[in-house]
Amino acid sequence: MRRACRMIALWILAFPMASQALEKEYVAPPTAPASDQPGWHGSLRVGANVNFTNNRKVVGQQEGNQFQIGAAFDGDIGYLLGEHDWRNSLSLLETFSYGPPVRALMKTADTLRFETAYYYHPVKAPWVGPFVRASVLTAIFEGADYRAAPTLYEVQNETDPATGNPRQETGKRFRLSESFLPTTLRESAGVFLNPYRKEYLDILILVGGGSTQVFADGQYALKDNPATADRIEVMRLSSYVQAGLEAGLALSGAAYGGKIKYRAYGDVLVPFYRSDKAAGDNRNLGDLTNVELGAMLSFKLVEWASLDYILKTLRQPQLAQDWQVQNMLLLTFGYSYSRRQFQPPPPPAAPAP
């Protein structure tokens, strides 16, 4: 009993010591002016996790609560030279669950993201300048909906040629998405503002034009109607292109010498152009505005373990009308490595004669 009490006390004392972020939604400017840190720099983080996840209306992923195991990878590399700042990041998160009543290996989180960005920091005002960035977001594995008993699935926007009614399919498993689908490509260019930059708070503002290409033909999303208990409604997804005004805000910081880290972000795209407008679709700009919001809070328990909470919300009304919401609580065991390669200092001047 005393030993158990001591272990609980040690856990409580270790809990406020925090961790590194698992995901990067933006490629941010460096923590010091570019001219102060020339050369290559990068970091690498790999880990395994035991997670509790709640998914609600996430395209291609299982809904509900699951106990999971998985792996995470997060790496970045960049180059700083004078006013030029080039940054790249790659992140991967995979979690799977297995248990009753389905007793099948199911994926509950599957995210692969790559982003590259270029910032130009003018010498006289390094906190404001032009930027360009591009990113790709996809999933590696096939997505499916599993049920413990045979279930009737009804695809609302597909017609059965034999009956003229919505297509129906019965089974314990319904395929939602193929590998590497849906895939979202994003490009943007504009002006960045970094008006405040301290260890405890870093503010990054992005304003400009952006475009989005979503590849989703032949994929499906659950759109169940609670009033119909005898079936599960499904919607077939379609690919599309959008372009318009884009704005973003990212707040990040650290406390207790970097042992607690936190981050919140928001990104909005108002599409002035969209492809594949269906007949009778009279939605306005507000109805079609894309919104991405998220937050992260990370606690470092020990050097090799962290407790992380991640919230991600996504609104893509041309893909799926409902908000996609994902909550993740991760106990992560991992290893991190970082390296900076600075340019050598200039040789000393020759002594005066």
How would you label these PLM feature ranges?
Residues G210-M296, K300:
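Outer-membrane beta-barrel transmembrane domain signature
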Residues V46-A48, A71-Y79, F114-Y120, V136, ...:
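Residues on the lipid-exposed face of transmembrane beta-strands in outer-membrane beta-barrel proteins
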Residues G42-V46, W86-L90, F114, V128-A134, ...:
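Transmembrane beta-strands of outer-membrane beta-barrel proteins
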Residues E83-W86, A125-G129, E199-I203, S252-Y262, ...:
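Repeated loop/turn-to-beta-strand initiation elements of outer-membrane beta-barrel proteins
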Residues V325-P353:
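Outer-membrane beta-barrel "beta-signal"
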Residues V50-A71, P100-A104:
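Surface-exposed strand-loop-strand hairpins of Gram-negative outer-membrane beta-barrel proteins
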Residues N65-A71, M106-F114, L181-E187, E233-A243, ...:
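Residues that define the transmembrane beta-barrel architecture of outer-membrane proteins
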Residues A48-N54, L81-E83, L92-Y98, A134-D145, ...:
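Transmembrane beta-strands of outer-membrane beta-barrel pores
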